[in-house]
């Protein structure tokens, strides 16, 4: 079984990666699993830049294959915000509930057709001795007026998936892992991972 380190401490992301990679024969480890505690400063201006920073930092320190994810929510009405600041939208402390409240407050009174949004995910894979490669995935939808569902994490309870009458948080893990922005990016990354 090939070990792959996922450059995150986010348990929700780790669960999604494990569900998608372990059946394919990969031993998935998070930063917490390997005892890595320092914060990696995300200084990039794009999801892709931040994913590369994280993947290269961890791969350089461990000498292992590393996949890094930088993802977030882009709301058209808000000019693409929260974007790369999705996790810290309501402040430096990463707080899902505070982020949701801030987003919903900013969209108060905005009609559904103007609440279009997308989840975006950039994945970077750093294989020691090779050039870091990136892929992206996205899923379109709308922001609801209030949270719905208890599955998932982050903005999932307010993200109504286009062509479905369910938020990401109302989908089962299996359903979400078929259509999510991360799943789309991971499908693209699979060929690169298999070459490792």
Swiss-Prot record:
Keyword tags: Hydrolase, Magnesium, Metal-binding, Nucleotide metabolism, Nucleotide-binding
Source superkingdom: Bacteria
Protein's name in the database: dITP/XTP pyrophosphatase
Entry's cofactor comment: Binds 1 Mg(2+) ion per subunit.
EC number, UniProt record: 3.6.1.66
Function: Pyrophosphatase that catalyzes the hydrolysis of nucleoside triphosphates to their monophosphate derivatives, with a high preference for the non-canonical purine nucleotides XTP (xanthosine triphosphate), dITP (deoxyinosine triphosphate) and ITP. Seems to function as a house-cleaning enzyme that removes non-canonical purine nucleotides from the nucleotide pool, thus preventing their incorporation into DNA/RNA and avoiding chromosomal lesions.
Active-site residue list: 70 (proton acceptor)
Subunit structure: Homodimer.
Coiled-coil regions listed in the entry: none
Binding site for Mg(2+): 41, 70
């Amino acid at each position: 079984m090939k070990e792959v380190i996922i450059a995150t401490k986010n348990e929700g992301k780790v669960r999604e990666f494990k569900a998608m990679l372990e059946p394919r024969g990969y031993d998935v480890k998070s930063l917490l699993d390997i005892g890595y505690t320092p914060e990696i400063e995300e200084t990039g201006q794009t999801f892709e830049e931040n994913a590369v920073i994280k993947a290269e930092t961890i791969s350089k320190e461990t000498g292992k294959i590393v996949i890094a994810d930088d993802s977030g929510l882009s709301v058209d009405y808000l000019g693409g915000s929260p974007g790369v600041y999705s996790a810290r939208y309501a402040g430096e402390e990463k707080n899902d509930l505070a982020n949701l409240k801030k987003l919903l407050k900013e969209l108060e009174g905005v009609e559904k057709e103007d609440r279009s949004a997308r989840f975006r995910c950039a994945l970077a894979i750093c294989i020691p001795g090779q050039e870091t490669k990136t892929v992206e995935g996205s899923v379109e939808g709308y922001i609801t007026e209030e949270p719905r569902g208890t599955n998932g994490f982050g903005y999932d309870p307010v993200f109504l998936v286009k062509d479905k009458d369910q938020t990401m948080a109302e989908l089962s893990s299996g359903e979400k892992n078929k259509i999510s922005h991360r799943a789309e990016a991971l499908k693209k990354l699979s060929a690169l991972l298999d070459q490792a």
